[in-house]
Curated annotation (Swiss-Prot):
It is a multi-pass membrane protein. Pfam families: Polysacc_synt. The lineage of its organism: Bacteria, Pseudomonadati, Pseudomonadota, Gammaproteobacteria, Pasteurellales. It comes from the Bacteria. It comes from Haemophilus influenzae (strain ATCC 51907 / DSM 11121 / KW20 / Rd). Disulfide bonds: none annotated. The keyword NADP does not apply. InterPro entries: Polysacc_synth, PolySynth_Transporter. This is Lsg locus putative protein 1.
């Protein structure tokens, strides 16, 4: 009953927090236009890339530390991770300053505070503080919307840059208050240099093997935008990116359920109540759910989307449907990969990701030389390819336990 209650809280929190940006789409689509939205999508690609580098999946390291070693020295790992993010982030900021790119500077700074905030969310997830987690998420999106509207209404030029700046301000404000509350609830303790060194090695040991894994996610989620930006037009990218953004609603629901279930999933594995054969059955049955969102969207007339987004976005529905298919393929993926995460098989996860990414990139390159309407199929091919690989890897790991 507890897992169901938390799942509902996480789901409602995630959906309500993302509802504001979703409602903001008609405003952004009209304010930026299809070309401006395409340009925004391009620069958000760099924000995602910077986040991978400065974060080094600290939220995952925090979660695993909590369940394996307890909460006694959790603050040591949190602060050490923050120090790493600050140093690496500063190097990226210097690079942006040398390149004299103000918009990339904002993107880099935003990635730093987003990494800080992700750690705070991970701590609350580990502590099963579902309400606190949901409140932070909702606060982040509300402040993001307020800053976005304020900046885009006040300024008339460089609106894409102002949208990135709004994201930065939102991350900064919400992280400041969430960290303030975290510090109030945490007992201060002095640690020696060797303790910080051990914590850093733990973070690096957890995160570095996963660099390829998350780099693979970046390539699958962002590389297509770079290809389209340079191969086709900003208008084409705007339609494509809008379809992907709309499909994000389903992804949010899936991720919310996953985050709510993970603590109980790990506990079941720890107590030997869950075996790999059950996970394989769940992954297989989940394929029945994959076509449902796309079929629902196929029935809805495109006029509805055009009415919401504006007349410039005719053609978005086609991309929306295809992205829904590739998005829902994450359900069997998460079922299988969480098993490997629990047992710390990060190298295996990276190997799986690299193999599927190679397949995806090869498909993307080939499809780029056709027409833009075929490019979303690269995502479907890449998402499908990793599932049999994970099936084999989870079976292999279960035999060694």
């Amino acid at each position: 009953m507890k897992v169901f209650k938390d799942s509902v809280i996480y789901l409602v929190g995630e959906l309500s927090s993302k509802l504001v940006p979703f409602l903001l789409l008609p405003y952004l689509s009209r304010k930026l236009g299809v070309e401006g939205y395409g340009s925004l999508s391009y620069y958000q690609t760099f924000l995602s890339l910077f986040l991978i580098v400065v974060s080094l999946t600290q939220e995952g390291a925090i979660s695993r530390y909590f369940y394996f070693y307890g909460k006694r020295s959790l603050n040591l790992v949190v602060n050490t991770g923050y120090a790493y993010t600050t140093i690496i982030g500063s190097i990226i900021l210097i690079g942006c300053w040398i390149a004299q790119s103000e918009i990339l500077f904002y993107a880099a700074l935003s990635s730093i505070f987003q990494s800080f905030l992700n750690v705070q969310l991970s701590v609350r997830q580990c502590q099963k503080k579902a309400w606190s987690y949901a409140f932070i998420q909702f606060s982040l999106t509300v402040t993001g919307a307020v800053f976005t509207v304020a900046l885009l209404e006040y300024y008339q030029n460089d609106l894409v840059e102002k949208r990135i700046l709004a994201i930065l301000l939102s991350n900064l404000v919400v992280w400041f208050f969430s960290y303030f509350l975290y510090r109030k609830s945490t007992t201060s303790k002095k640690y020696q240099f060797k303790h910080y060194q051990s914590a850093l090695f733990y973070i690096l040991g957890f995160g570095l093997p996963l660099i390829l894994h998350y780099a693979s996610f970046f390539l699958k989620g962002q590389l297509d935008r770079i290809f389209i930006y340079h191969k086709f037009s900003e208008t084409d990218l705007g339609l494509y990116a809008m379809g992907a953004q709309l499909a994000l609603v389903v992804s949010i629901a899936i991720q919310a359920l996953n985050k709510a279930i993970i603590p109980y999933f790990y506990e079941a594995l720890k107590q030997k109540k869950l075996v790999v054969q059950q996970l394989h059955k769940w992954a297989l049955f989940s394929f029945l759910l994959i076509p449902i969102p796309a079929l629902i969207m196929w029935i809805i007339p495109e006029d509805v989307l055009v009415w919401i987004l504006g007349s410039q976005f005719v053609g978005t529905k086609y991309y929306f449907i295809l992205f829904l298919i590739s998005t829902t393929l994450s359900i069997p993926y998460l079922i299988l990969v969480n098993y490997l995460f629990y047992y710390g098989k990060n190298k295996l996860i990276s190997q799986c990701s690299v193999l599927s990414t190679i397949i995806y990139v090869a498909s993307l390159v080939a499809l780029t030389f056709t027409e833009i309407k075929y490019i979303p199929y690269a995502g479907i091919i890449g998402s499908l390819s990793i599932i049999p690989i994970l099936y084999f890897m989870t079976s292999k790991v279960s035999k060694t336990l």
